């Protein structure tokens, strides 16, 4: 399954400037997802992080991975079954940042579903620029009614 930005804004509750997934290139719901965040110099966080040396904040890379994970969960259901659902980030474990992400990079977001208990899902997540791993984290997220 693939999703363009029009699909993504129907799935996620986020909006600019906090929508950090631009496209889904592969999604096997509840198994794995591969998505893209195009990093541009126009991102509002580059104004202060850092002037004259722009680097995407690590917490926003993790947020991108969490949003991709949420799409993996929410994208599996029909519009009617997921309409009143939201995915909340519960925890981030073992986050590692290996290389800076800068304007012009295409951030490839990979989230692999590991298991679920009740409404809590665990994902092993990786971010790449090209073939190079730039970040990784284990994410726990909870599906809730709103």
From Swiss-Prot:
Catalysis performed (reactions): a (3R)-hydroxyacyl-[ACP] = a (2E)-enoyl-[ACP] + H2O
Any one GO molecular function term: (3R)-hydroxyacyl-[acyl-carrier-protein] dehydratase activity
Enzyme Commission number(s) from the entry: 4.2.1.59
Catalytic residues of the enzyme: 49
Keywords linked to the UniProt accession: Cytoplasm, Lipid A biosynthesis, Lipid biosynthesis, Lipid metabolism, Lyase
UniProt xrefs under Gene3D superfamilies: Hotdog Thioesterase
A cellular component term, taken from the record's GO annotations: membrane
GO terms for biological process, alphabetical: fatty acid biosynthetic process; lipid A biosynthetic process
Location within or outside the cell: Cytoplasm
Source organism superkingdom: Bacteria
InterPro entries given in the database record: FabA_FabZ, FabZ, HotDog_dom_sf
Family, similarity comment: Belongs to the thioester dehydratase family. FabZ subfamily.
HAMAP family assigned: FabZ
Purpose of the protein: Involved in unsaturated fatty acids biosynthesis. Catalyzes the dehydration of short chain beta-hydroxyacyl-ACPs and long chain saturated and unsaturated beta-hydroxyacyl-ACPs.
Name of this chain's protein: 3-hydroxyacyl-[acyl-carrier-protein] dehydratase FabZ
Organism annotation: Wolbachia sp. subsp. Brugia malayi (strain TRS)
Taxonomic lineage from the root: Bacteria, Pseudomonadati, Pseudomonadota, Alphaproteobacteria, Rickettsiales
Gene from which the chain derives: fabZ
């Amino acid at each position: 399954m693939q999703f363009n930005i029009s699909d993504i804004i129907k799935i996620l509750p986020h909006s600019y400037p906090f929508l950090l997934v631009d496209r889904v290139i592969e999604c096997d719901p509840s198994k794995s997802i591969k998505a893209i965040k195009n990093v541009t110099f126009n991102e509002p966080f580059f104004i202060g992080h850092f002037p004259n040396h722009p680097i995407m904040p690590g917490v926003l890379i993790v947020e991108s991975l969490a949003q991709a994970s949420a799409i993996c969960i929410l994208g599996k259901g029909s519009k009617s079954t997921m309409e009143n659902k939201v995915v909340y980030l519960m925890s981030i474990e073992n986050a590692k940042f290996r290389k800076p992400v800068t304007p012009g990079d295409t951030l490839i977001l990979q989230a692999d579903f590991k298991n679920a208990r009740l409404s809590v899902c665990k994902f092993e997540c990786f971010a790449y620029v090209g073939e190079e791993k730039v970040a990784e984290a284990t994410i726990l997220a909870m599906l809730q009614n709103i």
